[in-house]
Design a protein with these regions (language model features):
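Conserved active-site and SAM-binding loop architecture
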Residues: 1-215
Length: 216
């Protein structure tokens, strides 16, 4: 994502975007990251062989199977499923559960790979008390941003961040804000890329992305 790379580079970091898609013509390396994570977990050759503990991975992991709205889909009570038969709903449950299982295994294997290789990893995902990783993951998030519009984003939606092999800094650097009208978020393909707001990203990075041993 060009905005993310630009903001990282403005702080002196070299940044590359890896993604399975290139829908905005901004991806540096188009690759199936899920397959690469699986290969790295199985200790096979993968892109993780070229990533060291001096690098940092920022993972904007697909969230649509983890967030609380998915419960309505599992129960068949969301508007789009109200006219479905019980059989259709149950078949859909099987599909959702397979996708949830894939997402959960992949994000967990990503964390394990980074722990093994001592690679700093920061994972971003929506926050709620019913978020699947909040309830069923061994590693708790370390930062919860309850109102992203305060950092110039379009969305207020609470967001959480996991820090693995690194620690967050909590210092605040105040800059003038660029206020944006709030927008609603709809469901997307489970593996699709997010669109980023550069103002929020810059403020989140400037707030202090991580420290190692007390130093950045």
């Amino acid at each position: 994502v060009e905005h993310l790379k630009m903001n990282l580079k403005s702080f002196g970091y070299e940044a590359f975007d890896y993604d399975i898609q290139n829908e905005f013509n901004e991806t540096d390396i188009v690759i199936d990251l899920f397959k690469e994570i699986e290969k790295a977990y199985d200790k096979q050759k993968s892109i993780f062989d070229n990533i060291t503990e001096k690098d940092t991975i920022l993972a904007f992991f697909p969230c649509v199977r983890f967030e609380n709205q998915i419960e309505l889909h599992f129960r068949g009570t969301c508007n789009s499923l109200k006219k479905w038969s019980d059989e259709q709903k149950l078949e859909y449950d099987l599909k959702l559960h397979r996708e949830l299982d894939l997402m959960y295994e992949t994000i967990t294997k990503l964390a394990i790979v980074c722990i093994r290789k001592k690679i700093p990893l920061i994972i971003e995902n929506p926050y709620s008390t019913t978020h699947y990783l909040v309830k069923y993951w061994a590693i708790p998030s370390k930062i919860v941003d309850k109102d992203r519009t305060l950092r110039g984003d379009y969305f207020k939606k609470p967001t959480q961040y996991w820090f693995i092999n690194c620690e967050p800094k909590y210092n605040m650097i105040f800059e003038s804000y660029s206020w944006n009208k709030k927008k609603n978020i709809g469901h997307t393909n489970p593996r699709s890329k997010k669109k980023f707001n550069s103002t929020r990203i810059r403020k989140q990075i400037h707030k202090g992305i991580y420290t190692r041993g007390g130093k950045r």
